[in-house]
Amino acid sequence: RDKIGVMFGCGSWYTNVTLADGSTEKLGKIVNQKMDVEVLSYDFESGQIVPRRVTNWFNNGKAEEFLHFKVDRAGSGTGRGHASLAMTRNHLIRTPVGWREAEDINVGDRVMLAQPRLLSDQQWEIVLGSLMGDGCLSPPVRQDSESARLRIGHGAQQSAYFDWKVSLLANIPHSRTVNGKGAAFVDFSPLAELHELRSAVYLGDGKKFLSEEYLKGLTPLSLAIWYMDDGSFSLRSKGLQQRTQGGSGRIEICVEAMSEGSQVRLRDYLHDTHGLDVRLRKAGAAAKAVLVFSTAATAKFQQLVAPYMAPCMAYKLLPRFHGRSMVTPQFVEPIMELMPARVTEIESKTDYPIMSRFDIEVEGSHNYFADGVMVHNSPETTTGGKALKFYASVRMDVQRIETLKDGTNTVDNRTRVKI
């Protein structure tokens, strides 16, 4: 545009601003008292949420209307099931594709919400291994919530292993139950950071889908969890004689819960990445898919995972690999990160006891969080005049999730596109 004007996008008195220590304060109170405070703000250069000083305060007079938004927040049942903010129609709110005016956002759209990331690298590895085995990612109580809940269950005879695994995830809020047969289950609090993983693994056909990217994320700890969950070991020799020194045996791991393509990719991954001689076969009257390791591959695989096995699972190892377990819990302090969150409700408000419109200016980064939702700060500019051209852009994240083959020839790719 040739001309620059001024606009007065603002928030209501009652909108909670997230302060640097994680607490909140009413926007109107911050402005009226010109509070010298630091707020949380997103730094585009570092890609981190950081504390920033408020450098100016604005009361721009009475507003005729505010748009009150409710935004889904992971952790339903903790009293923080949604974020809440009220803005004028022209206030800028951050979305996954950039800044948008409040009036252009609809129910079902996504905005950027600061949410805690709780999982350490070690715990992420455990999640990946558990999903390949006895674990699952279930939807939260609110089906439209963009989070996922990790659930793990084991029979009564594996109670020690169950306790060991839960101890590695003990900092995540959870509840434990036991059924009539003595089987134990643990349900962890929904986490926003697991939503994308759940979307990638469960495609709606009842089988778990493991992409090439998923397999690249596996570590020896992930493989150990998978093996302890679904693997069996047949010890053929304890190695008491010289010709069988060190012992020998064979591993079989059930992969029936995975899609056929995932079974093949996993077999190829084990061969190409770890040099393991592994084949797929159908086992038993139910013809369930299992991965069968050769004797040499069994020893090589167990050498890889032995340091990450639970002590109570030593019976799944050759005798020479006993006593190598060295896993200890690795917890991290929660880190606030921007994550897309769904708008669940928008309501026009014209009857607040205080209808004045307020805003603040934030040092350097010029944004702050309204109850966790990223919004722009003042001062802002109006539309001006003499518009020459208008542009619209949509960002698409295209990922290859499967290579389709005809025999050994690659004929196509299966992709997922996220708008």
Curated annotation (Swiss-Prot):
Q: Name one Pfam family in it.
A: LAGLIDADG_2
Q: What molecular functions are annotated in GO for this chain? A: ATP binding; ATP-dependent activity, acting on DNA; endonuclease activity; single-stranded DNA binding
* Entry keyword Nucleotide-binding: yes
Enumerate the transmembrane spans. none
InterPro entries documented for this protein: DNA_recomb/repair_RecA, DNA_recomb/repair_RecA_CS, Hint_dom_C, Hint_dom_N, Hint_dom_sf, Homing_endonucl, INTEIN, Intein_C
Cellular component terms, GO, for this chain's entry? cytosol
Q: Name one GO biological process term.
A: DNA repair
- This protein's UniProt keywords: ATP-binding, Autocatalytic cleavage, Cytoplasm, DNA damage, DNA recombination, DNA repair, DNA-binding, Nucleotide-binding, Protein splicing, SOS response
At the top level, the lineage of the source is Bacteria
Q: Could you state what the record's PTM comment says about this protein?
A: This protein undergoes a protein self splicing that involves a post-translational excision of the intervening region (intein) followed by peptide ligation.
Where does it localize?
A: Cytoplasm
* Homology family: Belongs to the RecA family.
Report the protein's function. Can catalyze the hydrolysis of ATP in the presence of single-stranded DNA, the ATP-dependent uptake of single-stranded DNA by duplex DNA, and the ATP-dependent hybridization of homologous single-stranded DNAs. It interacts with LexA causing its activation and leading to its autocatalytic cleavage.
Name of the protein = Protein RecA
State the organism of origin. Mycobacterium gastri
